[in-house]
Amino acid sequence: MTDSVRLQWLADLFRLLGRTGLGKRKSTGKGSFDVTGIDKCNLFEAIDNPNAFLSLSNFVPAPGDPTEGNYRVMVKYGKLGEEFALSKHPFKHPLLMIQAGSVFRVQGMVRAYYGYMIEDIAPAHPEVLQYALAFSVPVRLEA
């Protein structure tokens, strides 16, 4: 897949997401947006010898993920969306997550993501998963 095909694919996905909306008020029209353009950005590719990652999203570390770093935790009280929101049990179990903006030292290469998908998060709906992956950005921390 060429870069231009990837960018077009990504733009199409964001346009669809923009029409659908994001967040808990999307059913009332909140969270919608328009995509005016997408350009490739290599801002994070120019980091020399990264030894840590910055998480751009809240996440739950997977076994074996780095533990040394600076971070804050939060409790996410999730609610199901779409057709599940109207069920008798629309809430997810509370989930302890690492907040976006956290930084963790790594040994070796920085991976594209950390964390994992959480199963058994909605008692009445075992098919529901909670996205708990970190979008990681390589950074260089001083010793």
Label each region the model flagged.
Residues 1-143:
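Basic, Gly/Ser/Thr-rich N-terminal segments that form RNA-phosphate-binding interfaces in CRISPR RAMP
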